[in-house]
Amino acid sequence: VVSDASRWNEKYAAASLASALRVEPLLESHQRDIDGLLAPRTALDIAAGTCHAAVYLAKRGLHATALDCSAVGLGLGEQLAKREGVAIKTTTKDLTVTKLPGGPWSVICCFRYLDRNLFPQMAAGLAPGGLLFYRTFNVHHLKKATAFNPEYVLQPGELNREFSTLEILSLSDGDDPEENTSWIAARRPA
């Protein structure tokens, strides 16, 4: 059995540095909320891959930490950060067996990765007034990607239930059968 880290390292070893910073639309649409954050102005990018979200948040003035199982992907992220003129911290972690680093975090984000065991840690790791940004595939993705593992898709209403202690800023929770991702932007009450 090939480990997740080996599989992702192999994938990223065949990749080259992205020609441009790819900004997650959920972050971009909440840029004003991000820019208005108070201290500690720290960000945690979970399952960061090549760190585009961490680099974007660093460019917005946050101290960004990127976590991923792939040292190769994080290495590409460090190159991206350098090219974009910012510094990020990268940490190689197997997220399936590791607890998230303690906060408090001003921003926690995670895109295209699902480990439901992390949801309580994500909510608890936010600083008062901190922001959560999360997007991944939902059950409607299985119509197009029939080989995709159904354990790794969100069910309708799941994000609203899992993050009920947070104030929802925007939410698409699997109700639209034409939308194959679900997302949430939420704030921890101050």
Identify the meaning behind each predicted range.
Residues 40-47:
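Conserved class I S-adenosyl-L-methionine
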Residues 174-190:
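Core SAM-dependent methyltransferase catalytic element
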Residues 130-137:
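Conserved beta-strand signature within the Rossmann-like core of class I S-adenosyl-L-methionine
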Residues 100-107:
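A short acidic, Gly/Pro-enriched loop at the edge of an enzyme's catalytic core
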Residues 51:
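Glycine-rich SAM-binding Motif I of class I
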